Structure formats: C-alpha cells, structure tokens
Amino acid sequence: MSQTINSELNENATSQCKEDLKVSLSESDLRDSQGQLGIENPPKCNNSGNHSDNLGFIEQSETVHPENEKALTPDLRDTKIHTSLPITTPFSKKRAREAKNILLKPFKSPLRQTASPQVADTNLKPSLAVTNLNSDETNTSSEPVTSPLRTTPNSIKRQKRLFKSPISNCLNPKSDPEITQLLSRRLKLEKEVRNLQEQLITAETARKVEAKNEDKDLQTLIQKWKNAAQQAAEVLFKPMAERIRLAGGVTQSFRIEEGENKGQIQEVRTEFTMSMFLNQFGVPVHLMSFDEENGDWKS
C-alpha cells in the first residue's frame, strides 16, 4: 500500500510541475510580446487561478524606449560579409557553357570555302557563238525563274555545267589535223631559234675577246701557269719516286703473244718516271710540255 501511495504522489507532483512550467512559459511569452507593443502586463495568476491583487501588489508594466529599441535591433553594418564563395549568376554560367561548347567543336579549316554566287556570276561570260546562245536560251526557258539574290549551290553548278566556251573546240588539236601539224612545226621552229640564239651569243663573246686584243696577255698567263705546275710536279715527284724505289720499284706486266711462251704474262720492273707520276694524277703529259724521250721539260 505504501508503494502505491508513493507512486500516486510522484505522479501528482510531476503533473503539477508540468502545469507550472506551461503556465510560466505562456506568461513569459505574453509579457515579451506586450512589452514590445508598450502594453501593460495583466495581473498574474497563481497556480490556483487567483489574481495577484489578492497578494497586495501589482507588477508595473515595462515600457520600451526608442533608444532601447534601437539597441535591440541589430545593425546591418555589424553583420559580416562572407566573400569566401564566388557569386555565380546565370549569365556567367551561360558564358562558361558557351566557351566549353566552342572548345568541343571540331576544327574547320578557313581555306575550305564554298563558292559564292558572285564568284560564279563573274566566271560566267557571254558566248560568242549564235548556236550556243540559242541552246542556252532554250535550256534556260525550260527552267523555273529564280531570283538572282536567292541563288543556291545547285543552280551555280547547273550554270557552270551549261556554259561551254567556243574557243575550247578550236584549241583542241584532236579536232583538226591541220592544227596538229602547225603546232609540231611551231615547236621545231622554236627549238631552231633557241639554237641560233646560243650560237649568236658565243659569236658575240668571241668578237669581243678578239676586239680587246688580249692574246698576248693570255700567252703570258699560260706560260706562267705551266711554270708553276712544273715546279709543283718536281717538288712532289722526288719523295714519291724515292718511296717507290725503296718498295721495290714499279712492276709492269706484259703478255707474250709469240714464241713458245705465248699467252704467258711476264713482269718487268722499271723505274718510276715523271710521265707515270703525271698520268697517276690525271694530268696530260703534253699539257705540261714534258718530253718523255729526254725525260725533261720542253722549253
């Protein structure tokens, strides 16, 4: 029995505390709202529902002054501005999207341009032949009339196909055998003219050289070149001949064409001469004025 009584007392105490908390919370909320509006607070009620005038005092209402109201309201200048995150607008997103689309587009060469109607019109020239004019008129009359400002690529291609120059038939060599003969004759004459021009140039240079009378100067220069070449050959010939002599000399092979030993090869050792030296370097002996019989230079 004592346990049941204690439990009932505890439940009554907890319920009474809950009701007191609800009343105090409602009164505090009402007081705050009335204080902001400048209305005096009504008399308080206790837990039993009696007014506070039974206790002998009335709480004075608290009025809110303008200065206190300003102090209560926060100032916008005191608020912190958050600049860590970038401000994104729909316009900036659109620009970023357009830039991304441009980068993803495939490359197109600027040199590949379609033919414009103006260029096609300038390429078209009036035909000189009457027959071609008549044929063009008949072809164009059957086609529908289109505005020149609205020319399509198909119409441009059609105009290019229809146009035929009358001069192209005349220049075609297969059309006329006489033209082929004339062209071949023209090529031969041009070749002869070029040969004659070259001969004329050489004759003019020879005439200029003869007119200057430079033969004496040329003879002196030739003799000067021969003397220098002979001196160089003498300087190079001596050490080379000495080396060949120490190596055993020069062997010359001869094929026997007569007698018992016909067909056999016979080797003969000879001395190294100036003529061999000059021939080995590819210099003609007569150009250096060398006498092979005497083994000396000609004067």
UniProtKB/Swiss-Prot annotation:
Region described as Disordered: 1-52, 132-152
Presence of keyword DNA repair: yes
Subunit structure: Interacts with swi5 and rhp51.
Subcellular localization: Cytoplasm; Nucleus
Entry similarity comment: Belongs to the SFR1/MEI5 family.
Coiled coil: 177-236
GO biological process assignments: chromosome segregation; DNA recombinase assembly; DNA recombination; DNA strand invasion; double-strand break repair involved in meiotic recombination; double-strand break repair via homologous recombination; meiotic DNA recombinase assembly involved in reciprocal meiotic recombination; meiotic joint molecule formation
Biased composition (Basic and acidic residues): 17-32
Its biological purpose: Involved in DNA recombination repair and meiotic chromosome segregation.
Biased composition (Polar residues): 1-16
Keyword Transmembrane helix attached: no
Gene encoding the protein: sfr1
Name of protein: Swi5-dependent recombination DNA repair protein 1
One Pfam family recorded for the sequence: Mei5
